[in-house]
């Protein structure tokens, strides 16, 4: 994938970049793997706002992705590589030998015609999925399960990858993209390779309207709100926040304040904490 730059024909175009979509082979998704996707606008079933900065955006259909990769022993072949509006990574349509079709996350380097396989006996090849116990130390992986059979939950964004560091009893040590080293059950599955579309992070949105197309609403500073809307609000003119430390809209300390529970059940699985950014 390459980044496409634009001439500054307007203020919105100046500095704007997009993907050239060179890896995409079709713009028509597989109809049998589409599901309706209803917009919530960040509201829950009571109509109350639970997630800020969401609303509007282009209409989408959900692509049903196979995160479990549990079709063991049946070879499949990549039919298309497609754009997915619901995630940063591209997706690949797999045609299996028994006639079934499934979408998977498209790893870096995958092409139309590539053969893939799932299961303990699969080769260590990009796109294949195996239990962690069967993956050699040093292998780069993505789409990692946390519970056997639940489906991949970690390392699914564009350009991300993890690495198998070692094996201890029924656990496998994996270094995640954040630098965190975590123990994961050896029966959990992972896919070989790095997630594709790795230059996604280099894209410059360019203008506010492009964020609105994505369904992202503006983020307003608390200091320009009224006191009943935010702890930083109020005052005459450009007033300071009037607090010892920055606060969230709900009055909790923020910007550097640690929010992780002191006694989290998953602490025993974390060998090394993530790197400070």
From Swiss-Prot:
- Residues spanning the signal sequence: none
Q: Which GO terms describe its cellular component?
A: large ribosomal subunit
**Mind telling me which Pfam families this protein's record contains?**
Ribosomal_L2, Ribosomal_L2_C
Statement: the UniProt record of this protein carries the keyword RNA-binding: yes
Please list the GO biological process terms of this entry.
cytoplasmic translation
Recorded GO molecular functions are:
RNA binding; rRNA binding; structural constituent of ribosome; transferase activity
What NCBIfam families does this protein map onto? rplB_bact
- What is the official name of this protein in its record? Large ribosomal subunit protein uL2
Organism (species): Bacillus subtilis (strain 168)
Gene encoding this chain?
rplB
């Amino acid at each position: 994938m390459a980044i496409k730059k634009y001439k500054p024909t307007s203020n919105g175009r100046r500095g704007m970049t997009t993907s050239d979509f060179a890896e995409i082979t079709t713009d028509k998704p597989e109809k049998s793997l589409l599901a309706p996707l209803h917009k919530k606008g960040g509201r829950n079933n009571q109509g109350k706002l639970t997630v800020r900065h969401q609303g509007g955006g282009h209409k989408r259909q959900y692509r049903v992705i196979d995160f479990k990769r549990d079709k063991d022993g049946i070879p499949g072949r990549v039919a298309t590589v497609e754009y997915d509006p619901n995630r940063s990574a591209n997706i690949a349509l797999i045609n299996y030998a028994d006639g079934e079709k499934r979408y998977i996350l498209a790893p870096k380097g995958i092409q139309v015609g590539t053969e893939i396989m799932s299961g303990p006996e699969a080769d260590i090849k990009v796109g294949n999925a195996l239990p962690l116990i069967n993956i050699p130390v040093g292998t780069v992986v993505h789409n990692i399960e946390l519970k056997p059979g639940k489906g991949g939950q970690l390392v699914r964004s564009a350009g991300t990858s993890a690495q198998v560091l070692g094996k201890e009893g029924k656990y496998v040590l994996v270094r995640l993209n954040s630098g965190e080293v975590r123990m994961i059950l050896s029966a959990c599955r992972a896919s070989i390779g790095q997630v594709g579309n790795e230059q996604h992070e280099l894209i410059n949105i360019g203008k506010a309207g492009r964020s609105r197309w994505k369904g992202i609403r503006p983020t307003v500073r608390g200091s320009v709100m009224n006191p009943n809307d935010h702890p930083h609000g109020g005052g005459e003119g450009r007033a300071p926040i009037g607090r010892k430390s920055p606060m969230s809209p709900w009055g909790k300390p923020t910007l550097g304040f640690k929010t992780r529970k002191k006694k989290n059940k998953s602490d025993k699985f974390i060998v090394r904490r993530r790197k400070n950014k």
